[in-house]
Every structure is written in C-alpha cells, then in structure tokens.
C-alpha cells in the first residue's frame, strides 16, 4: 500500500457493471512520482515523504532545487508534494511510486482545485433563498442584512456575500478505484473529481 500519487485529470465517461447499470467515472493519468525526501519525527517533527511530479529539464530549475534533487538522483521535477506515512523507514530516496501500488476497490482521498466560475451572487454562491417576486416587493435577489449598526459597527470577517465562486481547494473522500492500468499509468475512479481536464489531482490512500 502506497501513501499516494499525483496525476492529471483526463476527463469523465461512463462504464457499465455486470447488471447493465451505467456508472459515471473519471480517468486520471498518474505518471510515476519519485521520492525526493523522507521526513521523520526525529528530524522534522512528523513522518512523511516528499515526492516530485511533473518532470522538468534541469536547466529550467533553480540551483537550490537542483541540489535538493541530486540527493535522490532525480532528473528534475517541477512540483513537489507531501504524503503523511506511518513508517517512513519503508521508503528510500529515489523510489518510484506508480499506479501498481493501488488496487481495484481501494478507497482514496482526492484533492484538487474546483472549476472557477467567476463573480457570483449569494443565491448561486451560497444557496440563499430569494425574496418575493410579486406583491410590490423590491427584494428579489438582494443579500439582506449583513450585520447590526452601531454594535458591532462592522461586517464580521467570513460573512457570506457575493464574490468569486469556485477555484478553491476541494477534497473528495472515499473515492473508489474501479480500474488500474499499470502499462498506461491510468486510474479510473468512481464519480466526479474536482476541476476540469488537465487539472492536477492529489490521490492519497486512506490510512
């Protein structure tokens, strides 16, 4: 069992089970990730592994990162991510994490950036109820009160108001793996996943 892997969302389609029911699925291209650093409670205060993903030419990487990658014999990565692990001793610098570490039926936690939908009002963004549409009402889609007057005399931080909808970090829990292709480095997961095609997804195994 592996800690996790990073991949790119390909898109959605549907497959059919033995009973003929259509199941919506998402395809993820998960190229091998390399272990670039091993963190332990003794040295860093917690147990985790750092992996590199999205290969990049060394000429396009800063000198400090090049020195960091030389320790694990890496050819170069553009991005890095961490996965918490219970036993970091089982990993070695330079180890490759591939789709072969996952199995059909395994439940994983998928994190990505949701699709940005621009500026939106309260009803679309926060599911507020609208006001009366007739009988002389002038409050159709207004937000209503946003706080009291003299006390506190300000709008509390975090007040639900109109603003940027989407483009936020989103996590899908208990997403089930339905198919694993070791040759093509593809995972097929049940249901939808955050973001649009080519979005980077963090797939973490349930501990």
Swiss-Prot record:
Belongs to the universal ribosomal protein uL3 family. Signal peptide: none annotated. It comes from Emiliania huxleyi. GO terms for biological process: translation. GO terms for cellular component: chloroplast; cytosolic large ribosomal subunit. Disulfide bonds: none annotated. Residues 115-151 are annotated as: Disordered. Part of the 50S ribosomal subunit. One of the primary rRNA binding proteins, it binds directly near the 3'-end of the 23S rRNA, where it nucleates assembly of the 50S subunit. It is found in: Plastid, Chloroplast. Coiled coil: none annotated. It comes from the Eukaryota. One of its GO terms (molecular function) is structural constituent of ribosome. Transmembrane segments: none annotated. Its main location: plastid. Keywords: Chloroplast, Plastid, Ribonucleoprotein, Ribosomal protein, RNA-binding, rRNA-binding. This is Large ribosomal subunit protein uL3c. InterPro entries: Ribosomal_uL3, Ribosomal_uL3_bac/org-type, Transl_B-barrel_sf. Pfam families: Ribosomal_L3.
